[in-house]
């Protein structure tokens, strides 16, 4: 696995894409870093294979799914209410660039979220990348594989696609309602997993 990860890392440098997370392992945990301890709401759901480190706040009814990594070593990372961070997502921040997710934000599988702010009700698609200082408005949809470069800003209700990403159109009421439906479904799914998930091997 280490050899494969090194190979993909070299490809990442050459082709500017993010390697698949071969470095994730089981038995991840919640860590204090120095004086900083994650603040996780009692109603939040964090799987036992997720990693949460340091200056991280996770608010009510949010869910952190399998093999998610949230590393709050340089700046505060704030996850609002009713958010969901799906499998393999990575959240980090550089000095001077705190990371903030407003309420009802969905982060898709293997997305990379770095030192940015994402407005209420927005969804970040699978393997999308959002870099330092970027600002995503409310009720935006960031498409799968999109690359949002440093400092880029998008208004509310934007459909954001491409690498580098650009706003394609304005989302309509039905689009926005679907984003909310997805966020709501993860709140319910997390409650179900809390009650019914049982490890058998």
Kindly give the residue locations of the regions a language model identified.
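C-terminal segments of enzyme domains that contribute to small-molecule binding surfaces
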Residues: 28-39, 47, 99-107, 111-112, ...
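Single conserved hydrophobic/aromatic residue that forms the stacking wall/gate
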Residues: 1-15
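Left-handed beta-helix
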Residues: 42, 47-48, 53-54, 59-60, ...
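Active-site cofactor/substrate anionic-group-binding motifs, chiefly glycine-
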Residues: 77
């Amino acid at each position: 696995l280490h050899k494969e990860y090194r190979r993909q890392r070299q490809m990442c440098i050459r082709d500017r894409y993010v390697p698949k997370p071969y470095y994730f392992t089981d038995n991840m945990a919640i860590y204090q870093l120095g004086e900083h301890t994650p603040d996780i709401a009692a109603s939040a759901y964090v799987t036992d294979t997720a990693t949460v480190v340091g200056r991280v706040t996770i608010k009510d009814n949010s869910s952190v799914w399998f093999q998610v990594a949230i590393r709050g070593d340089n700046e505060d990372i704030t996850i609002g209410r009713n958010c969901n961070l799906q499998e393999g997502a990575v959240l980090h921040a550089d000095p001077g660039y705190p990371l903030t997710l407003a309420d009802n934000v969905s982060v898709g599988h293997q997305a990379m979220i770095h030192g940015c702010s994402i407005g209420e009700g927005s969804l970040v698609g699978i393997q999308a990348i959002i870099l330092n200082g970027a600002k995503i408005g409310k009720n935006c949809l960031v498409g799968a594989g999109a690359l949002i470069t440093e400092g880029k800003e998008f208004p509310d209700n934007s459909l954001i696609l491409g690498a580098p990403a650009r706003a394609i159109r304005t989302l309509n009421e039905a689009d926005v309602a679907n984003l909310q439906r997805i966020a709501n479904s993860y709140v319910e799914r997390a409650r179900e997993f809390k009650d019914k998930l049982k490890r058998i091997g």
